[in-house]
Amino acid sequence: NPNLLPEEQTPVIDLAKTLSPTQKKSLEENLNNLEMQSGWKIKYLSQFESVPGIAIKNYWDLDETSLLVIADPRGGNLLNFNVGDAYFSFLPRLFWVELQTRYGNQYYVREHGEDGAVLDAINSVKICLEKGGCQVVPGLPKEQYLWTLSTSILGGLIAGFSAAPR
């Protein structure tokens, strides 16, 4: 339904009212500044019952430098991403899976709210773009990273020894 799109250009269309007016204004300013300074376009759409559909692509002129962040509470995961091809040079496909599962899952949303999940996910992308790319989503505590690394190595050793011929 293209009638849902605002007359004026804005990088934030919050149909589901996920963000407070202050958060929305701040996000609009941040995303506009990011686009002016770097050329990367991040757009945010929250939807609930009515959706603008394919009209959103023309409204925002989405291209290979565009990231569309969609928040839709109707599914199992709050967040979905429509990622322009240029992003994959800096942020691999697994980054987007991790981003969605970390911030869009029901437990994170329950603890931080829909607004927190959306803003944290967008902030993670911005941090990675400013750093020139990321292989994983930033913010994993060092202890958790080391624990995961050590258990993976230990599991590999156990599997290797048990598979070795005797």
Walk through the language-model features, giving the residues of each.
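C-terminal single-pass membrane-anchor helix
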Residues: P138-R166
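Folded, non-transmembrane soluble domains that reside on the lumenal/extracytoplasmic side of membranes
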Residues: N1-L149
